[in-house]
Amino acid sequence: MTTSELVPPPPARRSPRTRRRRQDKPALSARLVLDDHEINGDVGVLSEDLFTDLFPHLRNVPSREDGSEDIHHVAIAPWEPSPSPTETAWTVVPVLKSSALKPSTVQFSPSSLSLQSFATILQQVAPSKLSSHSRSGIEVQILDVVALSLDTVFVSLESELTKRLEQGEGTFFRDRPNKGKGKAPAQPDTPEDRLISALRVALGSLKVLHSGDLFSLPLPPHPVTHVPPNPGKIMLCEPVSQGILSDDTKIVLMRGRVHAKRGQSAPAIPPNRSLNGVPEDDEDDTANDQFYSAAEDRYKTDAATTEMDTVTETEESDLSGVDHDDDLSDDFMDDMISLQAPTLPTTASGVSTMQPGTPMTIGRGRKTNGIATPASVFSNFTATTARPDRPRGRLFKAQGLIRPILIDLLHPKPAPEDDEEARIFVDIASLSKIGCFSGDWVRVEAAEEPPANGFGAFGLGSFTSLEPTESNWRPVRVYGLPEGYSQRPVTRIPSAKHGERRMSFFESQLQKPTSPTAYISPVLLANLESPSYLRLSPIKRGTYQGKGTLPKFTSASRPPYARDITIQHVRSPVTAERAYQSAVLGGLKRYFAQKIRLVRTGDLIAVPIDTQLGKALQEQPSANGSEVDDVMALAKDESCRFDQVAWFKVGHIQTQKTDADHDQTEDLWGGVACIDSSSVAMHGSGFATSRTPATKASTWPYYLGVKKMPMKSNGASALMVPEQDQRFVSPLRRRLRELLAAATSPRAIHLKMPPVAILLTSTHRNIGKATLASEACSDIGLHTYAIDAYDILSEAGTSGGDVKTEGLLRTRSERAMSCGPDTTALLIKHVEALTADRMVSTMKEILQDTRVLVATTSDVDKVPDGVRGLFSHELEVGAPDEAEREGILRTIVEDRGINLDPEVDLNGIALKTAALVAGDLVDVVDRALVAQRLRLEQISSKTGQAVTVRDLQVAGGAMARCVTKGDFDVAVEAARKNFAGAIGAPKIPNVTWDDVGGLNNVKDAVTETIQLPLERPELFAKGMKKRSGILFYGPPGTGKTLLAKAIATEYSLNFFSVKGPELLNMYIGESEANVRRVFQRARDARPCVVFFDELDSVAPKRGNQGDSGGVMDRIVSQLLAELDGMSGGDDTSGGVFVIGATNRPDLLDPALLRPGRFDKMLYLGVSDTHDKQLKILEALTRKFTLHPSVSLHSVAQQLPFTYTGADFYALCSDAMLKAVTRQAASVDAKIRELEAQPRSRTGPISTAYFFDHHATPEDIAVMVTEEDFLAANRELVPSVSAGELSHYEQVRAMFEGPPEKDRQQQQQQQQRPSGLRAVSGSSVVSKGKGKAIAGGSGKGKGKAVATGSDDEYGSEGEVAVVNGKGKGKGKAVAGFQDGTASDDEGLY
């Protein structure tokens, strides 16, 4: 293969007539033929009709002059009924046009490397097609695609092979010399270049690269054994999982050592891994202790295994002795036995039931049968088998289908008119155990759960109750599951080596074998009363008593046809609405017209309907009822979007009596009759009340198409029957479900217990209260009739007022009760809107007629007291925590069938969406889907080819088919911005720690207070108190507000800013209510920061205000009460941090500064050193363009120590303004010089013309020089004077103690041998009673209390009393000498 042929040219160059946007066409069916006689190489050939259908725009393109044809790309996949670009596993392959092939044929060589990925997919979906491809070909589906150029390819090689390539062996050994249009590249010199060149040549041997493909290396084989080297493997491709190699593709090498099997050399790459008859899973596993089991039909057990065991497919061990004479094998390849030399296991030490030479009764969960195995300790004689006339059959675990299985996949293929509801599916290996063939009639009945141990049901009265119970059974057709729908059970078979002690007999009794599974329609399972286990047995062929010689009962037989049938409406909110009647009746007609239905008296019939289509047709002015019904009946399922289900119940059935043995026929078919809509008389007999199947144990919403199916897990087959996942259920939903179940239980109805009235309250809108109630009702099978109070008010309008509103409420509630009081829950949304006085009596009357009433409100205070007192339970729906948000996100993703990238961590997304409720999380998922679509459209537009979004999805990969982590990041950021606006939080600028200069000690204290509870909540889980209040105080302009914004940005917290006037209200009690609302919003939006700016105006000292009513005092009291709950260790207030800022802490109420409130006081002052000023200048000028000659250090040396942070900001802004002014003057001067020069241009030169034609980079760049800073400094007036700064230092000393210099003087002067100490500066100036600051001068008499000293006496808490003389009395208090945040390192 030549170098020029390694990478095919892009499609855009091949065909100049290719349209810019290609239209997506549906997939076509074709046959894949593997024939190595007519075609060689990796490129396949395509029949002419397929080429014309797939590439119609290339129909008239002339061929090349040299006769060569262009390589096109198509995507193939194993045939399935409904292929999808996003869910089907496609394989992109290169093809050429051929006119010699049969129509609808794709032909490849069996040794084509392009089919490696397809063979792997086929092995998972339909392994039997691998061995039958040579006879009739493989049925596939084919699409036209454009192969994308890959950005990055990750490959894996062994270390030894990598060294050989680096040494240049791959450069000299090539299959063919390079030839073609391009010139041969230069010989690489370095080992890395030689490795890259060899890898690019090796990958170039693949026409299309797929993730997981193996590729041969350009290395010579072994000189002695002539075994080729081990191949390399493509681990990952980006941005899609398959594409072509280009010159810009990056190759990332992953080195490693591949360990071969014991006693076996590593195999070379086969021509085709799976299409040569050997399954991929078995080609490497050929160790001596590996064997294939015979057709023993043993199922997976729960026995503990170790890594030493060998995985193999096993089958059920219940031989049942003589009962299985017809258990014949079908000569599959799986039944081949690989013999090995028998070896005796090593004797186990101690007492064991596993000894050499004795019957092995238990072997790691493998259970032998008491009849077939001699000397066994098991027996089949149990209370179950001892019952007389017990029906025999096989026991299966019942599993409801999550989607219908199409008839095209079944064998034998059912008739088109056969009822799909009368089918049951089991594994093919289980058909012989039942004793029938696929498509035969069997008897299915509900069965009890088998006993958990091997002793059977030896319960009290097990043998005495011998009366046969009536079983709920019916005839159905049994079919084997199509290939790929189920995985054969895998268990661990012990190897020849004795690796561990065998289990004893009693330990083995704890191992419960899993029964085989029978898949059945969830509606049919509900008609069988939803049992957990089913028993299948063939219908006995009765002796023929009629005329003729043909047998009476065959697989083609049908139950007797019905002559007359009565259908009852199951009253539900859908069937009760007049607007949906046409859709309901049309759906019922469609249900019986499509198939010959098999029903029995009492059966439930589920009919999915499109309510939106039915309502739109019903509202047409010229709509006729019967015509609309006919239109709805003729609508195809593909064209409808089913959103509701109408339920019906079968009443009386009268069959056609054709012979005298009608009773025997009825006994044979269990009362089931065929309903042919063309010959049956169908009557409606009113309404019936009934529950629907409970959704917590049934899959009927997915089966009927009301909900989308969840995406299959990784590694699961696309056709596998998915089981119902265990959904997230919140504790409140579980509690609500229990209340509803108790209120509607037969015991509560019989005892006439009072109804249950539940009020769901919340402080958020769109939190999911109505959805919670509806889902809880669906879990137990109750109907939910929702009434919106605002809709009633809008319909009532102004005419009638309260009277009409009351009448509408009564009418809606009566309609809801017509669905059955014990089967329907009445849901009233926004009950706070019903404020009229007559509503109390109306609600009382409604409660008398119903069993369950649920109401929702977002403002419980607006609900009238009379209405609120009627509710027996009041449940608050709070904002979801992290675990609940993760569960809600997972439920949304599964309900919408969204495929997530494996790297997406829903727990991390839940952490980022703090304070968002269920409605906001739905918005997050919707935004992520939009972001994914935009990302795919952006990728397709960048390629420069006619690439559509479908081409990306067909190419596969997480980036193309899944919602990635980046999509969720974009969605979360947008949702948080919307949430911040909805709750009234201000838009926070992007302020980080880099914008805050200095303040290192403040940053450390903030980290300790805020970051520790957020990152390590387990430290505070046991009630440990945490600090949640921080008070910033100091001169104005020192960065208190800036620091609060930086805290909110750095820790991703919601930010509330509260001003003093916002809390004041003229009405009594509203000001305190505003404080409560602020903290309630903060708790709902946690983690968040509540920032009280100018706290002295919000919470001044109580008793000093002269306002009437004491409004400020009440605000302070309410604020204190809210702050007391912030430091608790429980979860009710965690994540709420309160930050206050003030420049007058002496005016605050002293109660605010006590422990548990604002107990962390941080002083933000001015910078007292030039180094601190330099840090501030660097933070403010980090986005400036400074002249290279500027030295911020020299600028800082010339600044006074009275500048605050705001002054530094003004200094830098003025310097930038001066630089811009200087640069503008320079440009004006150059323009004047140009105008003065003689030139051909007439007229003045504009500034825009100068920048377009004459400007140099120096003219555009605005650089700030040192002279600009100095000029701005000369003009700047400090905002805080030196006298004011000294006052703030005195205030700081009041709260934190004297400065460090005074402390050192005190420690020098207070060295006395006695326990009493003299306090420096203890004389106080005072003219009355009160407290004075220690450190004053003058004469007086008072007490000075020194606390927190460093000597041994002070540590014992002794008090020094200093007496003096003066004109008054006072107390001089020396504060904590090691106070909080006394270190002013890095302050402004």
Curated annotation (Swiss-Prot):
It is found in: Cytoplasm, Cytosol; Peroxisome membrane. It catalyses: ATP + H2O = ADP + phosphate + H(+). InterPro entries: AAA+_ATPase, AAA_ATPase_domain, ATPase_AAA_core, ATPase_AAA_CS, P-loop_NTPase, PEX6_4th_dom, RecA-like_PEX6_r2. Residues 169-178 have a biased composition (Basic and acidic residues). Residues 1-29, 169-192, 262-287, 302-323, 346-365, 1297-1388 are annotated as: Disordered. Residues 310-323 have a biased composition (Acidic residues). GO terms for molecular function: ATP binding; ATP hydrolysis activity. PANTHER family: AAA-FAMILY ATPASE (PTHR23077), PEROXISOMAL ATPASE PEX6 (PTHR23077:SF9). Component of the PEX1-PEX6 AAA ATPase complex, a protein dislocase complex that mediates the ATP-dependent extraction of the PEX5 receptor from peroxisomal membranes, an essential step for PEX5 recycling. Specifically recognizes PEX5 monoubiquitinated at 'Cys-6', and pulls it out of the peroxisome lumen through the PEX2-PEX10-PEX12 retrotranslocation channel. Extraction by the PEX1-PEX6 AAA ATPase complex is accompanied by unfolding of the TPR repeats and release of bound cargo from PEX5. Interacts with PEX1; forming the PEX1-PEX6 AAA ATPase complex, which is composed of a heterohexamer formed by a trimer of PEX1-PEX6 dimers. Belongs to the AAA ATPase family. This is Peroxisomal ATPase PEX6. It comes from Colletotrichum orbiculare (strain 104-T / ATCC 96160 / CBS 514.97 / LARS 414 / MAFF 240422) (Cucumber anthracnose fungus). The gene is PEX6.
